[in-house]
Amino acid sequence: MQFIDQANIILKAGKGGNGIVSFRREKFVPAGGPSGGNGGRGGSVILMADNNLQTLLDFKFKREIIAEDGCKGGPNKRSGASGQDTILKVPCGTEIRDIKTGIILGDLTKDKQSLTIAIGGRGGHGNAYYLSNQNRAPESFTEGKDGEIWEVQLELKLLAEVGIIGLPNAGKSTLISVVSSARPKIANYPFTTLIPNLGVVRKMDGNGCLFADIPGLISGAADGVGLGHDFLRHIQRTKILVHLIDAIAENPLHDFEIIEQELKKYGKGLLDKERIIVLNKMELVDDDYLQIITKKLEDLSKKKVLVISSSLKKGLSSLLSEVWKRI
């Protein structure tokens, strides 16, 4: 499935139905009073969160959503039928923003949570509405009101509790594949992962915790280099960041600093999040070098550094234990 996490769409509520002019005409009532009914309300456009959806792909080609118009009024003071509301299902974690003002209209984070965006137009009045002592046979009516039109941006931000971050080829996909049921594409070259991968990791008590493997960030990500903005937004909701560093990289310390700088530049509280620093691929370097680089990383980060091997499944219990302490 193609992963689409942003979409601009136009939402058009239905027009209210027109009122009508009608007079009661029956066999023994040749000159009855006004009986024109009111028009029905136009349908509204409602967004609803759905746990079964993972992407905004449905809106890639469907840019305009139009709700049903209300029906016109009828004789004998019958009101027209209201237009049917249009319910758009979106993934949990979808934020809705007004494109014109930039104002956030809502944030749908729970299954079945809904938000009415474009409200249907009110139905017009039929001539029965205008009956008065001064006017016993009104011929006035009003047309239905237009429905609201909104141009909005949908932005999906994943609801994972733990985000796994790091430069390309740090081993993020391998890690999530061995601690969860996720099965991302894995290969020994950068940028294998082009979309976030989600996996549920079970704790000792049986409860699940959602992990997200965020595609490799690079220098300049906070300024939009590569797909940086697209990926960084997905860690805004996480509680903990697992910063994975490749032990066989040319300069692991520099790699660490690149990601830290991108978090700082992007802002939005990313640098304030709990972070667990992890040195991966311990099996590919000798013990002396591993001790040296671990100590230097701890001095640089002012944090304890965990050492693991995702491929050999070493050190993972210590890593998960550290995660559970901080959730």
Curated annotation (Swiss-Prot):
Binding site for Mg(2+): S173, T193
GO molecular function: ATP binding; GTP binding; GTPase activity; magnesium ion binding
UniProt domain OBG-type G: residue ranges: 160-327
A Pfam family hit: GTP1_OBG
Record localization: Cytoplasm
Cofactor requirements of the protein: Mg(2+)
Binding residues annotated for ATP, in chain numbering: 166-173, 191-195, 213-216, 280-283, 309-311
GO BP field: ribosome biogenesis
CDD domains attached to this UniProt entry: Obg
Main localization, broad class: cytoplasm
Domain Obg: 1-159
Assigned keywords, A-Z: ATP-binding, Cytoplasm, GTP-binding, Hydrolase, Magnesium, Metal-binding, Nucleotide-binding
UniProt cross-references to PROSITE patterns, sorted A to Z: G_OBG, OBG
E.C. code: 3.6.5.-
GO cellular component term of the entry, any: cytoplasm
Coiled coil: none
Domain of life assignment: Bacteria
General function of this protein: An essential GTPase which binds GTP, GDP and possibly (p)ppGpp with moderate affinity, with high nucleotide exchange rates and a fairly low GTP hydrolysis rate. Plays a role in control of the cell cycle, stress response, ribosome biogenesis and in those bacteria that undergo differentiation, in morphogenesis control.
Oligomeric form and interacting partners: Monomer.
Family named by the database record: Belongs to the TRAFAC class OBG-HflX-like GTPase superfamily. OBG GTPase family.
Protein name per its UniProtKB record: GTPase Obg
Organism: Prochlorococcus marinus (strain MIT 9301)
Gene: obg
